[in-house]
Regions:
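Hydrophobic transmembrane alpha-helices
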Residues: 101, 116, 216-219, 353
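Hydrophobic/aromatic-rich transmembrane helices and adjacent perimembrane loops
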Residues: 344-359, 433
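Loop-to-helix entry and N-terminal half of a specific, functionally important transmembrane alpha helix
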Residues: 136-146, 324-332, 369, 373-376, ...
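Transmembrane helices and adjacent periplasmic/lumenal helix-loop junctions
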Residues: 209-226, 338-349
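Perimembrane helix-loop-helix junctions
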Residues: 221-243, 360-364
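Primarily membrane-embedded glycan-assembly and transfer machineries that use lipid-linked glycans
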Residues: 2-203, 232-347, 419-427, 446-470
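The feature captures the transmembrane alpha-helix scaffold of multi-pass secondary transporters
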Residues: 203-207, 396
């Protein structure tokens, strides 16, 4: 037998040994995940923008300036009017990157953000995959590139932003609340060490929100939500963490802390004009509608209070019905709406919003299929085939909107170009992401019993236990 034939047969035998025991569907799933990663990359190329770690250059330049003995909030990035705007604790946390080149700091942030996104999606998608009988690795493998293609995530990567790291801190508390509700410390952790029992018991819930608030003030709205829903221990942990970190920062960097809280915090013009297209908050919408660089103050305050009441009220109802994920999502989206500045890369809570809508569609369809077999039950002709269709369509539409991100083709800047230069359609597109999150705050559905976060018995938790037992 020729040597070439023998070599080919040896290679085939090696492949068979390696692939023996691997299910063919596993190979198919790996191929699908690879295809989705490639499609996500093409989407980023098609709809993303040129990224050069613009924000990371500001952070890096500011901490290098500070480490050289200068005042942190005196730094201005060359060729811009922008400086460091975060609380001083964020400056301390970023200080180690002063020893790195800016490109290295940017790529480390990208890798850390991807890891944070993967961990969060594992926690959020895992229960859905388990209920539907999908391999968790496959579901997460699809979710990560799909999320990476959206406007908030790709902008966070490209600008060197910290949004996904803060997102992970906040969602860690939601997972801790999940563990508290399940009481895992009472059964599955017996025999483990005290550190493991403490961690998986969820007793530290609130620390993530407290740390996030110390780095950026907008997560403080989650503390308000915790107080509103009477989750006292978690709220106290969050407040204690934020105060403890802030006081410790005063000890280490007293001058910068005093200047930030007495001066820099109130200088809203440090981050840019309200009407800038990437500002997809309510304030940005109103400024653009008025074709002004400034937001009409009283009108913004009135509508902000209304959206705050709607968002927190709906979040509290979602919590009471046992859906903590939707409650957290509503609070995050409400913070985006009412903040004076919410750049498009801040809108990361649209990711769990898509998941909530998709899961609501799956749950409704599953329930309809179960009911369709009940004898004597009269149902509409569309039942169950189209049940959950509107939630699925909303999930797909929301996802496509945040992948395509139609704000950029209609970007305008005063006084050179009016925000009405492209007519009504252009104005709608320029405000489309903001309008979407406002609509989500008002209409995002919750799923009773899906994510309970109670310390004792409650109707929602009792319902969930019965459903899981069945």
């Amino acid at each position: 037998m020729p040597a070439t034939v023998e070599g080919r047969m040896d290679r085939l035998a090696t492949v068979r040994r390696v692939t023996r025991g691997i299910d063919r569907w596993t190979v198919v799933r790996i191929g699908i995940v690879a295809g989705v990663f490639y499609a996500a990359w093409l989407a980023i190329e098609a709809f993303g923008r040129p990224y050069e770690f613009f924000d990371m250059k500001i952070y890096h330049g500011a901490v290098v300036w500070w480490a050289s003995g200068n005042e942190l909030y005196e730094f201005i990035q060359p060729d811009t009017t922008l400086g460091f705007t975060y609380p001083p604790f964020a400056g301390l946390a970023m200080l180690p990157m002063a020893t790195l080149p800016v490109a290295a700091a940017g790529w480390i942030n990208v890798l850390a953000s991807i890891a944070a996104l993967a961990v969060v999606l594992t926690a959020l998608v895992g229960p859905i995959a388990k209920r539907c009988g999908w391999p968790r690795w496959f579901a997460v493998g699809l979710a990560v590139p799909l999320a990476a293609a959206t406007e908030p995530v790709r902008e966070t990567f490209g600008y060197g932003q910290v949004n996904l790291l803060l997102f992970a801190l906040i969602m860690a508390d939601m997972v801790a609340l999940r563990w508290l509700a399940r009481g895992r410390a009472n059964h599955s952790l017996v025999g483990r060490g005290p550190l493991a029992r403490f961690f998986f018991s969820g007793a530290w819930a609130g620390a993530g929100i407290g740390l996030a608030t110390s780095i950026k003030l907008t997560p403080a709205l989650f503390i308000v939500y915790l107080l509103l829903t009477k989750q006292w221990r978690v709220a106290l942990t969050a407040v204690g963490t934020a105060l403890g970190v802030t006081v410790a920062t005063f000890v280490v960097a007293g001058h910068e802390s005093m200047r930030y809280f007495t001066s820099v915090l109130w200088q809203t013009d440090r981050v840019g004009a309200a009407d800038m297209t990437p500002n997809q908050s309510l304030a940005g919408v109103l400024a653009r509608l008025y074709d002004s660089v400034e937001t009409p103050g009283l009108l913004w305050l009135s509508f902000s209070l209304l959206m705050l009441a709607v968002g927190l009220s709906r979040a509290a109802h979602a919590h009471a019905d046992g859906d903590e994920l939707t409650a957290f999502t509503l609070v995050g989206l409400t913070a985006n709406v009412i903040s004076p500045i919410s750049w498009s890369h801040h809108l990361v809570f649209v990711i769990p919003a898509v998941l909530v809508l998709a899961d609501a569609a799956l749950r409704r369809r599953g329930a309809s299929q179960a009911l369709s077999g009940v004898s004597g039950l009269r149902t509409p002709i569309w039942f169950p085939a189209l049940t959950g269709l509107r939630h699925a369509a909303a999930a797909v539409g929301l996802y496509v909107l945040f992948v395509v991100s139609p704000i950029w083709p209609y970007e305008h800047r005063l006084p050179e170009v009016s925000h009405y230069a492209d007519g009504l359609y252009g104005a709608l597109m320029e405000n489309s992401l903001a309008l979407a999150i406002i609509l989500l705050v008002a209409a995002l559905p919750w799923r009773p019993g899906a994510e309970p976060a109670f310390y004792g018995d409650s109707p929602a938790l009792h319902f969930t236990r019965q459903r899981n037992a069945a």
